[in-house]
């Protein structure tokens, strides 16, 4: 993948850069109008003066140098004045412009491709890391961020970028290692796991009663549990009371009792052995599991719970990558595996091979390992990475 690289259209990035520059100018104009004066938007000191002294917004946090204008602070203020939302938008687009548009343009090699490097030993969990540049963190949460993917294209004119992504692989691993019958049943039946969990923690009779907000809360609980989240952490994430967050967590363990048993057992075994291990028996040593410092020990305990989950997910996609390359070689295909983004594999596919790839990639990924629940991989394709989503 490093040698092959992925083709990136500089013209698309340049056009996006022009579009973002216009948006930034418009936002600047609006912000200056509301502030009643021009100032340096990139200066926290000047921004703090405008927001908290001139516009009299309530200061939430102070630093050694003055008012904090961090994203966290601005998020809490955005309902109080439209200028705050515009400042947040400005920062977001400016970051995309500088980090991704300008940053990626500098990384395009003479062959028209970007050749990222993958580090196998940077993360403690075993996941691959992409550097020089990092192509695993192209933004997906904002429309402007997603646009960057339009520049990533196939190497042939009528070819495709093909993406195949494991569906909720960490939760499927959790269902497998914990042996929890209720969670396994949900995956075997093909239920939407977040809607299913919402049904359980809100004590509903049917998935039809689950609202989008309930599903969002259940999703935060599902993923939070994997990371050993506390009621305080969940309350902060969801903007709810600690009491309500505790109720969600208690209801979760009531509905999935074997997950609680797994967590207790994972900590106990880590104390006895000094390490946690993945389903492929790859170990992560945890010397801090016996620390006398509560915070240090608690982190090691959460790591004992989480490492077998995240680490096994990393093992699974690496096995899939090895098997996939063998399959491409065996069938003498010209398709190239060009990127790995956590639970997703991305391919550069000639038009003539698309039907073959649509069939074999999900098959190979879903059969990488055998779990007590099915592994599911979802495929999409298009004439660029943006359209393959």
Kindly give the residue locations of the regions a language model identified.
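Amphipathic, well-packed alpha-helical segments that form the structural scaffold of globular domains
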Residues: 25-32, 52, 56, 175-178, ...
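Short beta-strand
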Residues: 39-42, 336-341
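Conserved, non-catalytic sequence blocks in retroelement Pol enzymes and Pol-derived host proteins
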Residues: 41, 186-188, 309
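Short beta-strand->loop micro-motif that forms the acidic, two-metal-ion catalytic signature
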Residues: 344-349
């Amino acid at each position: 993948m490093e040698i092959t690289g992925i083709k990136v259209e500089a013209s698309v990035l340049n056009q996006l850069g022009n579009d973002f520059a216009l948006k930034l100018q418009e936002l600047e104009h609006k912000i200056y109008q509301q502030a009643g004066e021009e100032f340096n938007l990139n200066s926290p000191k000047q921004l703090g003066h405008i927001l908290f002294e001139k516009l009299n917004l309530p200061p939430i946090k102070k630093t050694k140098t003055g008012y904090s204008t961090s994203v966290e602070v601005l998020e809490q203020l955005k309902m109080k004045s439209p200028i705050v939302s515009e400042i947040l938008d400005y920062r977001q687009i400016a970051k995309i412009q500088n980090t991704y548009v300008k940053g990626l343009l500098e990384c395009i090699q003479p062959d028209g491709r970007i050749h990222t490097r993958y580090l196998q030993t940077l993360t403690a969990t075993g996941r691959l890391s992409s550097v020089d540049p990092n192509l695993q963190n192209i933004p997906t949460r904002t429309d402007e961020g997603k646009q960057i993917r339009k520049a990533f294209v196939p190497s042939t004119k009528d070819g495709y970028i093909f993406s195949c992504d494991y569906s909720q692989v960490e939760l499927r691993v959790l269902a497998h290692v914990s042996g929890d019958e209720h969670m396994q049943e949900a995956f075997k039946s093909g239920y939407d796991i977040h809607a299913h969990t919402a049904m359980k923690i809100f004590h509903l009779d049917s998935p039809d009663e689950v609202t989008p907000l309930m599903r969002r809360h259940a999703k935060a609980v599902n993923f939070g549990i994997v990371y050993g989240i506390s009621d305080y952490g969940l309350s902060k994430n969801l903007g709810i009371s600690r009491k309500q967050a505790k109720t969600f967590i208690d209801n979760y363990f009531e509905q999935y009792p074997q997950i609680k048993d797994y967590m207790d057992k994972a900590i106990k075994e880590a104390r006895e052995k000094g390490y946690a291990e993945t389903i492929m028996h790859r170990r992560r040593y945890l010397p801090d599991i016996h620390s006398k410092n509560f915070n240090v020990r608690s982190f090691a305990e959460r790591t004992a719970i989480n490492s077998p989950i995240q680490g096994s997910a990393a093992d699974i996609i690496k096995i899939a990558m090895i098997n996939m390359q063998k399959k491409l070689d065996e069938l003498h295909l010209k398709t190239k595996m060009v990127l790995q983004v956590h639970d997703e594999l991305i391919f550069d596919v000639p038009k003539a091979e698309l039907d073959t790839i649509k069939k074999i990639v999900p098959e190979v990924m879903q059969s990488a390992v055998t779990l007590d629940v099915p592994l599911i991989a979802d495929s999409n394709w298009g004439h660029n990475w943006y359209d393959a989503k």
